[in-house]
């Protein structure tokens, strides 16, 4: 007869817990991650966006393993700051669900930052036959606009500017499929149901080829663009914008193209390719290259960035005469575009189409709008890489509104910052 005693392993007992997760857990694919972990460990209950982050009620025999997987295998954009648990009574249920968002003040929730187009979406963008082939607003759980389209918290589709675009049946299926990369991805859309451009990419590319200045509505505001190799166009932009000496940022397709124009010290390539996609100030190469000397007059540096939206990639694609396949994305083409903030000197970045149409009329020859509202303006971030270290010069798109954690202790200090750049009319 088998002896009985305390040394025998006890069979796991079901339990139920409420878990409140704070940090960067809204808009980064965290709820789908919770859903998949629940299915993996046989956990029932629900997960939803709440006023203080993400709220989970989990029931099962493997809650600890479930929670360990949540933290150790979190999505790439997620950041867990705290995880608070409380025991609950068991409930008669048999499934796990993504629940409706809990309304209320969002004191503990963090708005995610905008993120550059991911490799998976970039591949789909240039795959003929894919339903999002050449779609200017392709995105998924791992990439796309977040902060700049958020109207209020908690972060859900109906609290963002994507609320204006009802999902088509096919996108709805992807949005509801736990195995899809677009499961509860709020920016999800397609050619049939998503935002639209005011004119074709081909028209804009033609204007750039002709030496014209183009205003382009992006995710956080308008850019002014021209061919960075066209000295007359660059000087014309400088004159129209009344920007005598300040350098212009330049966008190139990839780091192979960047290496043609700048030196790439340790850390520079990684920063250029980072999900934040800032303007990276780097030592300019001297000698015979084709960029206009009016880009950064009197300076030995050049600010470069890589494309971070589908519209940017589509522009390069059109300017290169629509190459097929994917290899062209990594090749050095030498193509370079000025991408500078579209604002009058001293004024904040323009985000409204009507405002852009009026105030940029004397600067831009062509204006490319889209009909997704920019809920929060965000200029391009600017960083400098030196001796392998990154120094942030302007902390904006890609970093905003992530908090900066400070060491404890020291005096209490009140810091105030204007939401937009001051203007003479303020």
Where are these regions (language model features)?
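Conserved small/polar residues in nucleotide/adenosyl-binding loops
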Residues: 419-426
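Glycine-rich phosphate/diphosphate-binding loops that line cofactor/substrate pockets in enzymes
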Residues: 204-212, 326-333
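Intrinsically disordered, low-complexity, mixed-charge
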Residues: 1-187, 191-195
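General beta-strand structural signal in soluble alpha/beta enzymes
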Residues: 214-217, 224, 250-252, 273, ...
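Internal gly/pro-rich beta-alpha loop/helix module
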Residues: 320-323, 331-409
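N- or domain-start disorder-to-order transition segments that initiate the globular core
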Residues: 196-206
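A phosphate-binding glycine/aspartate-rich beta-alpha loop in the early core of alpha/beta enzymes
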Residues: 87, 221-288, 375
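Divalent-metal (Mg2+/Mn2+/Ca2+)-assisted nucleotide/phosphate chemistry catalytic cores
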Residues: 271-272, 279, 283-347
